[in-house]
Structure formats: structure tokens, C-alpha cells
């Protein structure tokens, strides 16, 4: 490799496309340029036990060798090494210690370039890449990526089988080649637990879209089911394909099981209108919509009391009081909404910078306290309406939380607030600032540092149930 670089040899092994599936024909080309006066001879490329001769390279004359590459039928996908085994306890499982620290998976497709120099034969491993010209950036190279011939995408990751919620999921089967005949089913469910209500094929697109309706059961359950497409020949495809792409680093494609979490619960959800004031960004609105609430994202023109009064509750997204200037301009309107009987729920904010220091109807400050152990003990006032209406909260509802309990708890809390929840990390003092609430006029105000923005998208039932209670006050 050093000799190759010292001579200034330039080599490219380029595919005609960025993605290919096992068994696919991918026309490729080997391009080698020798800028030195030292002759390089007997150039060849070996890939999949086949040799492709390129001859000799004269000075500054590029050699171009067409490679009629056909990927092996059992070619492994370009899955990053840290995702090749299931995650355990939030840790990636890497079998080979030598790979740890490598930022990208080693290329799955490549060959061995051999050449003769001064009577000596040299060999160099070369990866297959894809090159294109961007009109703005110029020449860009990306790794050639092996993907499934067929993959799936689901319109939802979590589905709530609760009264009033939409129990429909769209499953899109994407074909890299021609559309294959086959059937869709769900591992973990029997055929009488769901109905395929419709199948659509869009003209000119290599997709087949299944509309699936899941049926409610008589008991509360939570299960993860696996969507899979089986061809008439018995081939099974059950993965999603996702690509991370930024201009300053190579693209990274990875594959995950096409799973859907089904949560069957007898939760009491009114399905009324809920307003959402966006903060730094979270996925709580999508979860509330999936639960059956009539959700509306509020903008700067919506801060009118006559308009806000239609909402059962208004929720402020995470760090809303750090990022949303409209909250500073219209905080008084929100307080009027609460006084008139509204329900305002403020998710965590950091202590600085705040767009306004007035977060609630009575004084409190944002501290830096947090509880990082997601399974840490919890104490709460079971008689308080937040934990008893309309759904009864018990200790089991605090099991299965992810990553943490909460952060940026309230401190220096005015006596007019109630603190019905006590949290603490092991070996630490208990903290009452994770959830505070107060009556103000005819309405209710809540500030919470609980990590609902993590728990709700993850489908943690107890956290979802508690958030429903916050809305339904």
C-alpha cells in the first residue's frame, strides 16, 4: 500500500449504482492511472474467484477495465458491525474487539488488485465504491451498499389498541427489482388478530402498500410483532432499510427488524382537542394523535383566549420556554386560559436561557436535579387526581421506563403548588420537583421534568397512562 501511494498510483473500483441486492448484476469498472515513469504491468483484479486482466499502465494513461460484477446470492448485507447482534441493556454487542472504534463497517464488496513492479508482484485490497457529481459540491464518493432485494416500512412503530384510537397501520413493501408475488403476515399474531383491508400498487413505483387493521382483545397486553413478506417461492423479507446521510461524512445504511409494538389497554381517553406548543422538538404530538386525541400544533396567531378555550389541554413541548419566543410574548394569555378552566402542561425546560422567567401562575425555579436510573424507586400520592383520574396509577406503571426518570426538576417551589410525586436515584436524596401542579382559577397547571419525550415514543405503557391523566384533569 505504501509503494502504491509513493508512486502516486490512482485506483478506483466504481459501481454504476450506490445500492445493490444479493444476486444482482452491478456493472462496474476498474480505473487505474500511473502518473510516474516507472512501468506497472500485469494489472488484474480478483473478485469472487474471478480474474479480470487490465494489462500494463503507461505513464499518465488510465486503464479502464469493465467488470461485469454479479453479487453473490448469499452476499451479506452492509449492516454496521455494532448492529449485527441485538442490543442488550442499551449496549451494542460486538463480537470482535478489533472492530471497536472503527467508525464504519468494512466494505462488504471489494476485490484484490495485483500488479507487477520491478519484477515483484504486489497485491492490494480495493473496495467497491459509487461516484457521482453533485452540481453544488462536485465529485462525491460513497460506499457501495448491499441491501435486501425487498424491504418493508411501517407507518407506525407503536400502535395503541385503545377505545377511540385508529387501529390501522400501512405496511409498504419496497422492491428493488420487479414486484414479487407473495403475502404479508405478522409473526407473533394469529390470522384472526388482524385484517388486511386493502392492497394498493402505485403505477410506476416498485411498491405494494398493505392497509392492516389490528383487532382489540379482551385483556391488556403489550407485544412486539414482526412484519414479514413471504414470496410464493418461500423467500422471507422482514427488515427495514434506513440511511443516515450528511454532507461531511460518508452515508451509512443500516437495517432493523420490521417490528410493531402493539399496546392493548383499557385506558380512558376522551379524544378531545389538545393544543401543542412546539419546543426544541419531540415526538409527543404523534403519540397523542395515535391515542385518539384531536391534536393541533399551535402557532403565533393562535394565542387568543376565545380560540384556546376550545382545547381540553395545551401541552408545551420540551424546552419550549427556552426556544419558543411566542411563549414569552403570550404567557399572560396562557395564564388566562388556565384561569378560565384550561389545563396547561409544561414539559421540562433548562434553567438558562429562558424566554421568560414566568413559567407558571406561581413562582418556582428550574433546577439541575435529575433522576438517571430509570428503574429507581418512586413514591406518589395515590389519592391525588393525577394518579387516580381517569386512570388509576400504580407502582407497576413505573416499570419499564427507558434511559431516565426525568431531568431539570422544579426547585424553590411556591407553597401553592402540590408535589404528589417523589423520585430519587439510589443513594441520593428524594426530590419532589419532578411533577408539580396547582389550581389556578378554574383550571390546572402542571410542570413536569419527567422524561415523557422519551417514554411516550418508546411505548412505555405506564408513562403514557400517566400523561393521559395529566391531559384529562
Tell me the role of every PLM-derived stretch.
Residues 1-23, 131-162:
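Low-complexity, acidic Ser/Thr/Pro/Gly-rich terminal tails and inter-domain linkers that flank the onset
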Residues 32-36, 172-177:
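Asparagine-centered strand-capping/turn motif at beta-strand->loop junctions
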Residues 55-63, 199-208, 217:
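Short proline/glycine- and polar residue-rich coil/turn motifs
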Residues 60-127, 215-224:
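Eukaryote-biased detector of low-complexity, proline/serine/threonine-rich segments
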Residues 120-153, 235-266:
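Short beta-strand elements
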Residues 236-317, 350, 454:
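Aromatic-Pro/Gly-enriched surface loop or interdomain linker
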Residues 319-399, 462:
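A glycine-rich, often tryptophan-bearing local segment used as a flexible ligand/cofactor-contacting loop or short
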Residues 368-460:
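Catalytic beta-strand/loop cores that center a nucleophilic Ser/Cys/Thr
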Amino acid at each position: 500500500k505504501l509503494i502504491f501511494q509513493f508512486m502516486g498510483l490512482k485506483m478506483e473500483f466504481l459501481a454504476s449504482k450506490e445500492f445493490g441486492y444479493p444476486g444482482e448484476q452491478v456493472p462496474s469498472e476498474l480505473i487505474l492511472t500511473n502518473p510516474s515513469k516507472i512501468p506497472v504491468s500485469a494489472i488484474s483484479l480478483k473478485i469472487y474467484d474471478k480474474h479480470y486482466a487490465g494489462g500494463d499502465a503507461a505513464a499518465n494513461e488510465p486503464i479502464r477495465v469493465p467488470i461485469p460484477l454479479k453479487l453473490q446470492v448469499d452476499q451479506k448485507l452492509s449492516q454496521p458491525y455494532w448492529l449485527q447482534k441485538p442490543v442488550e441493556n442499551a449496549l451494542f454487542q460486538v463480537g470482535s474487539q478489533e472492530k471497536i472504534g472503527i467508525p464504519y463497517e468494512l466494505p462488504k464488496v471489494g476485490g484484490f488488485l495485483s500488479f507487477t513492479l520491478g519484477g515483484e508482484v504486489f497485491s492490494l485490497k480495493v473496495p467497491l465504491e459509487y461516484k457521482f457529481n453533485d452540481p453544488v459540491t462536485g465529485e462525491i464518493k460513497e460506499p457501495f451498499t448491499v441491501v435486501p432485494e425487498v424491504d418493508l416500512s411501517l407507518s407506525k412503530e407503536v400502535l395503541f389498541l385503545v377505545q377511540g384510537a385508529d387501529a390501522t397501520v400501512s405496511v409498504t413493501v419496497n422492491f428493488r427489482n420487479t414486484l414479487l408475488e407473495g403475502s404479508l403476515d405478522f409473526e407473533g399474531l394469529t390470522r384472526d388478530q388482524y385484517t388486511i383491508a386493502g392492497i394498493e400498487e402505485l403505477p410506476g413505483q416498485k411498491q405494494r402498500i398493505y392497509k392492516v387493521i389490528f383487532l382489540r382483545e379482551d385483556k391488556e397486553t403489550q407485544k412486539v410483532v414482526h412484519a414479514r413478506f413471504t414470496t410464493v417461492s418461500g423467500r422471507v423479507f422482514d427488515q427495514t432499510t434506513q440511511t443516515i446521510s450528511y454532507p461531511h461524512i460518508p452515508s451509512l445504511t443500516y437495517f432493523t427488524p420490521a417490528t410493531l409494538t402493539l399496546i392493548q389497554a383499557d385506558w380512558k381517553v376522551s379524544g378531545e382537542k389538545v393544543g401543542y406548543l412546539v419546543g426544541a422538538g419531540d415526538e409527543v404530538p404523534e403519540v397523542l394523535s395515535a391515542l385518539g386525541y384531536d391534536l393541533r400544533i399551535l402557532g403565533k396567531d393562535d394565542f387568543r383566549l376565545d380560540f384556546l378555550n376550545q382545547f381540553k389541554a395545551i401541552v408545551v413541548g420540551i424546552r419550549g420556554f427556552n426556544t419558543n419566543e411566542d411563549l414569552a410574548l403570550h404567557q399572560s394569555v396562557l395564564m388566562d386560559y388556565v384561569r378560565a378552566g384550561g389545563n396547561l402542561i409544561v414539559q421540562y425546560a433548562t434553567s438558562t436561557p429562558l424566554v421568560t422567567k414566568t413559567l407558571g401562575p406561581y413562582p418556582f425555579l428550574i433546577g439541575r436535579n435529575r433522576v438517571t436510573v430509570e428503574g429507581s424507586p418512586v413514591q406518589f400520592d395515590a389519592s391525588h387526581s393525577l394518579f387516580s383520574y381517569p386512570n388509576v396509577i400504580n407502582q407497576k406503571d413505573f416499570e419499564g421506563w427507558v434511559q431516565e426518570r426525568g431531568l431539570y426538576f422544579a426547585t424553590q417551589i411556591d407553597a401553592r403548588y402540590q408535589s404528589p410525586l417523589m423520585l430519587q436515584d439510589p443513594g441520593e436524596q428524594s426530590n419532589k420537583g419532578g411533577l408539580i401542579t396547582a389550581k389556578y382559577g378554574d383550571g390546572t397547571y402542571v410542570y413536569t421534568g419527567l422524561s415523557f419525550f422519551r417514554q411516550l415514543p418508546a411505548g412505555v405503557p405506564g408513562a403514557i397512562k400517566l400523561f393521559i391523566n395529566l391531559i384529562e384533569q
